[in-house]
């Protein structure tokens, strides 16, 4: 019995990977084995960095809140502690946005928690 191969599916699978490798430099864009490795590595980086993005933004928000709170005479930890005890339910993202785009509103929050 002759060997059965599914060339249609094989070609479709390879075309899919080569399409994902579009824009790569050199053999990474058109040689199947090299492109497959490059796309696999790119997918790993994308997965890892989707997780890291959340951490990076949180640290950016903390830096912005800290800078704005220090201008008002409080450290970040003091400000967040007083914010929690005064039952103000604003998260770090909103606080950082207030600190950047409307400093007078942030200053009002600081005065309220002092």
From Swiss-Prot:
SUPFAM superfamilies: Ribosomal protein L20. Pfam families: Ribosomal_L20. One of its GO terms (molecular function) is structural constituent of ribosome. The keyword Ribosomal protein applies. One of its GO terms (cellular component) is ribosome. One of its GO terms (biological process) is ribosomal large subunit assembly. Transmembrane segments: none annotated. Keywords: Ribonucleoprotein, Ribosomal protein, RNA-binding, rRNA-binding. InterPro entries: Ribosomal_bL20 (IPR005813), RIBOSOMAL_L20_CS (IPR049946), Ribosomal_protein_bL20_C (IPR035566). Coiled coil: none annotated. Binds directly to 23S ribosomal RNA and is necessary for the in vitro assembly process of the 50S ribosomal subunit. It is not involved in the protein synthesizing functions of that subunit. Belongs to the bacterial ribosomal protein bL20 family. This is Large ribosomal subunit protein bL20. The gene is rplT.
């Amino acid at each position: 019995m002759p060997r059965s191969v599914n060339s249609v599916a094989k070609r479709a699978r390879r075309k899919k990977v080569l399409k994902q490798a579009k824009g790569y430099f050199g053999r990474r864009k058109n040689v199947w084995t090299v492109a497959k490795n490059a796309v696999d590595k790119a997918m790993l980086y994308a997965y890892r960095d989707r997780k890291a993005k959340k951490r990076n933004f949180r640290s950016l928000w903390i830096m912005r809140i800290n800078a704005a709170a220090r201008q008002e005479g409080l450290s970040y930890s003091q400000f967040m502690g007083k914010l929690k005890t005064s039952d103000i339910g604003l998260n770090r993202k909103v606080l950082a946005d207030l600190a950047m785009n409307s400093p007078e509103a942030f200053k009002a929050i600081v005065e309220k928690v002092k």
